């Protein structure tokens, strides 16, 4: 039974890099808010610098607008992290003859079912340079290639090759792209 089913978890947006970016945007937004309030009130609310010396119009006002923009961006980033957008699984079931690719979307879950007989090959794509892309995808008859790897940080090349070869062996199809 275990040889008939392969399930691969996919990491979503709940990663350390995303949490650090959201924290930095939050801290920066709070800093701009305190600088704007310091300029408006005429006394320093920040331990660094001397923001009370800034003229409220236009400098303090612009910093207040920056703090609002940072608050909106931080709210979006924390919501994406809390929902864990992009997480899910790839489930390959030989017994049922179906592949189920499921991901958590922003508003609702996304699930795609592909008949096992429509899979032509497993494709490993490696593109280095400015816009690096390393992914494993399924070449499906009558459809675009279906990506299986997570979005964001590229996988190490050795792990990418191993995952592609293991999946091609399990499905009994060719491995392309190496």
UniProtKB/Swiss-Prot annotation:
Pfam families: Ycf4. The keyword S-adenosyl-L-methionine does not apply. It comes from the Bacteria. InterPro entries: PSI_Ycf4_assembly. GO terms for cellular component: photosystem I; plasma membrane-derived thylakoid membrane. The keyword Membrane applies. Keywords: Membrane, Photosynthesis, Thylakoid, Transmembrane, Transmembrane helix. Coiled coil: none annotated. It is a multi-pass membrane protein. The chain crosses the membrane at residues 19-39, 61-81. It is found in: Cellular thylakoid membrane. Seems to be required for the assembly of the photosystem I complex. This is Photosystem I assembly protein Ycf4. It comes from Synechococcus sp. (strain WH7803).
